[in-house]
Swiss-Prot record:
The lineage of its organism: Bacteria, Bacillati, Cyanobacteriota, Cyanophyceae, Synechococcales. It comes from the Bacteria. Keywords: 4Fe-4S, Amino-acid biosynthesis, Branched-chain amino acid biosynthesis, Iron, Iron-sulfur, Leucine biosynthesis, Lyase, Metal-binding. It comes from Prochlorococcus marinus subsp. pastoris (strain CCMP1986 / NIES-2087 / MED4). Pathway: Amino-acid biosynthesis; L-leucine biosynthesis; L-leucine from 3-methyl-2-oxobutanoate: step 2/4. Heterodimer of LeuC and LeuD. InterPro entries: 3-IsopropMal_deHydase_lsu, Acnase/IPM_dHydase_lsu_aba_1/3, Acoase/IPM_deHydtase_lsu_aba, Aconitase_4Fe-4S_BS, Aconitase_4Fe-4S_dom, IPM_dehydratase_rel_enz, IPMI_cat. GO terms for biological process: L-leucine biosynthetic process. Catalyzes the isomerization between 2-isopropylmalate and 3-isopropylmalate, via the formation of 2-isopropylmaleate. The keyword 4Fe-4S applies. Disulfide bonds: none annotated. Binds 1 [4Fe-4S] cluster per subunit. The keyword 4Fe-4S applies. This is 3-isopropylmalate dehydratase large subunit. One of its GO terms (molecular function) is 3-isopropylmalate dehydratase activity.
Length: 469
């Protein structure tokens, strides 16, 4: 069993009690909620005449179902209007901080919390959303929970969990030019398999991880769940502290130095013990694209669709289904695959650095005539910053639609959907069957830069052909 890792330290600090059956009762330092998984939880509190235990440790925003084309109230979508109105009323009743549309701080919950300084090293963070692992980029232990656990956290600020094992993923060397965090994490999931992380927390480390910006680290941790891990984290360092300093909710003045000193003490010790260690050479990673129906089914842009015996054993069970659904054959090149829709956004890649990279590719270029392309900033703050830098004009001039913040086509709960058997180049995190709104829609996951390149050519392309000119 792991010893003296950051995960062990944070877990032990937040363990309230040992429970019958071997699980632990864990205190949650920050509870993030949104409009989709919270209504039933609040309803359960009302049924039992309970109040939120620590409303000051709960923060809400709207993201999943909000329209990105027209956010004037009331929304055209009655369900969206109802869900957001319900969250607003629940937050007022229970005195919970709520960042609504137009507040300047609304957006995807996993984008908003870090940019406000709510996410901090050493925290336990829970949210009714799979990609809560994003916050582990700051050295927190963050995990998605179901609606019943959302209820438990609202009522008690604790949940029952079995302690996870810890696997260190050591990324040697550095990423090459034109290779991004999205490429690296897709490669990791491909190498380990989509079930390898079950029962584990992933600690990402090594020179390649140290080189990444905080926003790139969030991309890595965001997709931990796609490799089966309940959470993923990175030890905090000077980049972490620099990013957090002077954020709205970060410690201020003399409390800042005290906080940094404590955060540094949480780092995995030199003599810590991991349950497993996986090593890879980051310098060998190519621009990576999914070809199948799990994030583990990915290849480099210049590679061919693998045959069954070339696929990781953990992924073989759906490989044949993926061939049929995606209309790919073993040995077929992924490069030059025609694209219909290009989407840049999501909690994985909807931050300002993602938009900057994509805009650099798009500048002085035009979206192909057959392509529908749109960019959805991850938050109102990201949108504001992008407009100040003129990024919105670059996207619009190239032929992209500029949208308002929200989850959008990542999960297609609003009107942003694929139609029929359209193929999308998407910077989101999941390529499951029907994920982007159409039962027959096909999703190719890739970095924002690769999406931008695909939008120009109308097909899967190597972004290095654009940035190395």
């Amino acid at each position: 069993m792991s010893q003296d890792t950051l995960f062990d330290k944070v877990w032990d600090l937040h363990k309230v009690a040992n429970l019958p059956g071997g699980s632990d009762q864990i205190l949650i330092g920050l509870h993030l909620i949104h409009e989709v998984t919270s209504p039933q939880a609040f309803g359960a509190l009302k049924d039992k005449n309970l109040k939120v235990k620590f409303p000051q440790r709960t923060v809400a925003t709207v993201d999943h179902i909000v329209p990105t084309d027209n956010q004037s109230r009331p929304f055209k979508d009655n369900l969206a209007e109802q869900m957001i109105d319900t969250l607003e009323k629940n937050c007022i009743e229970h005195k919970i901080k709520f960042f609504n549309i137009g507040s300047g701080n609304q957006g995807i919950v996993h984008v908003v919390a870090p940019e406000l300084g709510l996410t901090q090293p050493g925290m336990t963070i829970a949210c009714g959303d799979s990609h809560t692992s994003t916050h582990g980029a700051f050295g927190s232990i963050a995990f998605g929970i179901g609606t019943s656990q959302v209820r438990d956290v609202l009522a008690s600020q604790t949940i029952a969990m079995n302690k996870l094992k810890v696997r260190q993923i050591w990324c040697e060397n550095k990423l090459s030019n034109g290779i991004y965090a999205k490429d690296l994490v897709l490669h990791i999931i491909n190498q380990l398999g989509v079930k390898a992380g079950v029962g584990y927390a992933y600690e990402f480390a090594g020179p390649a991880i140290s080189e990444l910006s905080m926003e790139e680290r969030m991309t890595i941790c965001n997709m931990s769940i796609e490799g089966g891990a309940r959470c993923g984290y990175i030890n905090p360092d000077e980049k972490t502290f620099s990013y957090m300093k002077d954020k709205l909710c970060s410690p201020q003045n003399e409390n800042w130095e005290k906080a940094v000193k404590w955060w540094k003490s949480l780092e995995s010790s030199d003599n810590c013990v991991y349950d497993d260690v996986f090593k890879l050479d980051a310098s060998k990673v190519e621009p990576t694209i999914t070809w199948g129906i799990t994030p583990g089914q990915s290849i480099g842009v210049n590679q061919k669709i693998p045959s069954l015996n070339q696929i990781h054993p953990n992924d073989q069970f759906i490989a044949e289904e993926a061939y049929e659904y995606m209309s790919f054959k073993p040995g077929q090149s992924i490069k030059n695959t025609p694209i219909d829709v290009c989407f840049i956004g999501s909690c994985t890649n909807g931050r300002i650095s993602d938009l900057r990279v994509a805009a650099q590719v798009l500048e002085h270029n035009k979206v192909a005539k057959n392509i529908k392309a749109f960019v959805v900033p991850g938050s109102e703050k990201v949108a504001k910053e992008a407009k100040e830098e003129g990024l919105d004009k670059i996207f619009i001039k190239a032929g992209f639609q500029w949208r308002e913040p929200g989850c959008s086509m990542c999960l297609a709960m609003n009107s942003d959907k694929l139609i029929g058997n359209q193929v999308s180049a998407s910077s989101s995190n999941r390529n499951f069957k029907g994920r982007q709104g159409s039962p027959n829609g096909r999703t190719l996951l890739m970095s924002p830069a690769m999406v931008a390149a695909a939008s120009i050519t109308g097909k899967v392309s190597d972004v290095r052909d654009f940035i190395n000119k």
